[in-house]
Amino acid sequence: MKILTWNCNGIRARFPLIKKIIELEKPDLLFLQETKIEDKIFPEKEFHNLGYEFLFYRGEKSYNGVACISKVPFGDCGYKNWHDIEDCRHIFVKIKNTTIHNFYVPAGGDIPDTTVNSKFLHKISFLREMENWLRDKPSNRNEIILGDLNIAPLPDDVWSHKQLLNVVSHTPQETDLLLDVLHSGSFEDLIRQFFPIPEKVFSWWSYRSKDWRHSDRGRRLDHIWATNSISKRVSKVNILKDARGWDKPSDHVPILVEIELV
């Protein structure tokens, strides 16, 4: 089964590219973040025309939003409001006996200080709640977390570890906390399973960088994690970097995983 995750940065603006990636990669499941669209105008018909019958989404005007676009039926589905804020950052679906969570973690603003930046406080609180939520789950469960987690946790997940230590998305407070979330849930990092350290791996390049490919000042903000029962069934992980160079791109690129779900 092919699973693709992508922060599309606006489903309406990026729909031609979503259609293109579907035609190129033919994913069975497509998980989108930052859809920026209200549920009442979600493009259901357009996805049905592309062969995706099963949809679950939560969205709001201009901000946030997550979606699952599927060729295969799912059982349970739902969401959680994190940190008691209804801002459409999470959904889950159950495929066979595996639960897949789609997250869009808050970016955190510009100043990495919870005392002066409410957006950074929201991010840290969100992650701590994720950690507590995962801690008591059984380690032998079948579970995947994917999406835009808005943190590059390892030194080789950014173009310059030294220069980004005080930049939101790579501060020690964030990176330590995200790794705590990973470990509290007994997850494996599927991208690093296939692209081991010290290989530099990025999934995001700023719009401010005109020659993004040459300068390659990227960060790995997008992730796919799986519990052990699932991680050993993964046959391929591919970061679709060329999508960053398409016309009117997202600043994130899609990530594709091929996996046998149980």
Model regions and ranges:
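Structured beta-strand-rich core segments of catalytic domains in phosphoester-bond hydrolases
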Residues: 35-110
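Active-site beta-strand termini and strand-to-loop segments that position acidic
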Residues: 71, 93-97, 227-228, 250, ...
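Surface-exposed cleft-lining segments at the edges of enzyme active sites
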Residues: 106-127, 162-167
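Metal-dependent phosphoesterases centered on the DNase I-like endonuclease/exonuclease/phosphatase
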Residues: 50-51, 126-223
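Surface polyanion/phosphate-binding segment centered on an Asp-His-Pro turn
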Residues: 238-262
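Active-site-proximal beta-strand elements of phosphoester/diester hydrolases
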Residues: 1-9, 97-112, 116, 146, ...
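Conserved beta strand-loop-helix elements of the APE1-like EEP
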Residues: 62-76, 212-233
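N-terminal, active-site-proximal structural segment of metallo-dependent hydrolase catalytic domains
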Residues: 1-49, 63-66, 153, 262
